[in-house]
Amino acid sequence: MTQLSTKILWLFVAALGAICFGYLALQNGESVSAIYLVVAAVCIYMIGYRFYGSFVAYKVLELDKNRATPALVENDGRDFVPTNKAVLFGHHFAAIAGAGPLVGPILAAQMGYLPSMLWILVGGVLAGAVHDFVVLFISTRRKGRSLGEMIKDEMGKFTGGVAMVAIFGIMLIIIAILAMVVVKALAESPWGLFTIAMTIPIAIFMGIYMRFIRPGRVGEASIIGFVLLILAIHYGSVIAADPYWAKIFTLEAPTLAIVMMAYGFIASVLPVWFLLAPRDYLSTFLKIGVIVVMAVAIVLVAPDLQMPKANTQYFDGTGPVFAGGVFPFLFITIACGAISGFHALISSGTTPKMLENETHTLAVGYGSMLAESAVAIMALICACILHPGLYFAINSSSALIGTDVVNVAQTISSWGFSITPEEITTLTTNIGEYTILSRTGGAPTFAIGVALILHELFGGVDLMAFWYHFAILFEALFILTAVDAGTRACRFMVQDILGNVYKPLGDIHNYPAGLLATALSVAGWGYFLYQGAIDPKGGIYTLWPLFGVSNQMLAGMALLLATTILVKMGKARYTWVTLVPAVFVLVATLYGGIQKIMPYEEGNKIANAVSHVAAVSIQSQKIKDLEFKLNNTKDEKEISTIRKEISIATQNKVGNLLNAILCVFFMIATLLVIISCIGICLGKIKIPLKETKYIKIDEFQKI
């Protein structure tokens, strides 16, 4: 293709994207086809990768194809393993793409499709992809060091020490939440559990095939793995229909929680080429395959976005799906769909230890985040093609809308979104569920959206239930890969912390130390997971409200580290690349964090609904009132009921108090990183650059 034709092609892509984007932004009063959103997103991602990604890669970071990576230099056959770019892309994408891009945009859809679309597309290209890419680059230049260790090396021991503890706490919360989503999806689901279980032997076979049987034959292993995966999905439905096998593969949540912990431990201590990388690569076939099929199906089916462009009545924070104003809570809620601190832990955990060549960081780091942003766009579409009344029936709490279909329809219709009981019951029947009311959390909405689109092309209404349950399975597989990779990254983090106490424990080549660190990691997130599995109001459910804020604080810290390193590298003129998104993310997140620790304010329902401190005050007063009632009644039945209510209120009080304390600690850690970044950039704090020695690819074996 000539230079002129290339320019014409990119001008066409830019013009097409601008037209579709503009049409979505300017349309008023009428429903808009989802095709415009798909086309706008594809065009923006193409332009972002080709031009902005390349600018960051070769102007800002100056990637060097001749520089040896930690995988080549250390190559220990366990954690440091040079990995094919396509396989590593699959591993990295599978590891970072957890619950966030599926759930966040669906919840944020209560504000309308436009605010979420803007942040997912603009934030994904200019913030999230840059964040992942730059952190992967700087970790690769530092022997694959973890985020906390790099903050300690580059920004000072005290700041780094506090940050490491905060990051570890955030990591445990994130992994436990991801694991709980998987447990909820697979509990009582023999089809899902069988299919997920079968990906393990398939992945092991692929790992052995690519390393020993046919080294380097990634294409062959990919075809075999894909065929076996399709067979596993098919026979999962056969297993579910068989009374004997269905019973074997039907596990309750507490049992599944234990299985998850065991799997997380094993996957984290085995050589990365044996299970983790091939399983993540295999999962990526299904992940990207479903997203591509969804995009094509949307173009063919052309469903309308029925959600209004902007539900301005909820911008003040009075929405029924989640509390909090459009700023900052839209950005905090969307989270991983645009930018995620969890990605920094993978970009400084497993992935930098597997890079064959430094130039692969562009495709693996920047490209994977764009793929995740595309997942978020698909999730947003799944929410917005629903009738708004159905969307709010699914995502509003039963305390708000009730449990009777007629009352629910009347309540939601009074909000301005007309819906009939028949519409609710028809959809419920079509997807094979007993109810769709108050199926909060985002996952059921995504599955319903997938079913509504795919049944138009494959099978009609008769197969809508199949596509719904397939989507639930897809979500479980989608999220599980983030759990095993996250646990491995958490192990590196624990070893960094232990290494400050006893140096040999910090050696990641020390296998016994690795086993200890993995056990501590799994025990940490596993405790919260198991408690949540046996008590729907305890364990990780207590910490769930911290996920969004803590995750975004982590992203802000990572971007400030990147800014600091760019200044030390003599690239201060390019610091806007990381500093601008860092400032926006931190302003939004710290503002949200402050709202979460504000005291109770009489009459301010929105602020009180957001604040953990206010919740403590509310629950304390409730406990006092209940104790007064308890002391003034002699009815045994009423006494029993009141005591249960006191127990629940006490649990809520303790949970909110813990959240408030952790929120303050995470903000303190973030402020320390901000202060250190400012001090270093202004030359007030002198800490030398800690980049590892340059080794050429053709020389490293001689050293």
Curated annotation (Swiss-Prot):
GO terms for cellular component: plasma membrane. This is Peptide transporter CstA. Keywords: Cell inner membrane, Cell membrane, Membrane, Peptide transport, Protein transport, Transmembrane, Transmembrane helix, Transport. The chain crosses the membrane at residues 6-26, 29-49, 87-107, 118-138, 162-182, 190-210, 221-241, 256-276, 282-302, 319-339, 374-394, 463-483, 514-534, 547-567, 574-594, 660-680. It comes from Campylobacter jejuni subsp. jejuni serotype O:2 (strain ATCC 700819 / NCTC 11168). Belongs to the peptide transporter carbon starvation (CstA) (TC 2.A.114) family. The keyword Ribosomal protein does not apply. It is a multi-pass membrane protein. InterPro entries: CstA, CstA_N. It comes from the Bacteria. It is found in: Cell inner membrane. GO terms for biological process: cellular response to starvation; peptide transport; protein transport. PANTHER family: INNER MEMBRANE PEPTIDE TRANSPORTER, PYRUVATE_PROTON SYMPORTER BTST.
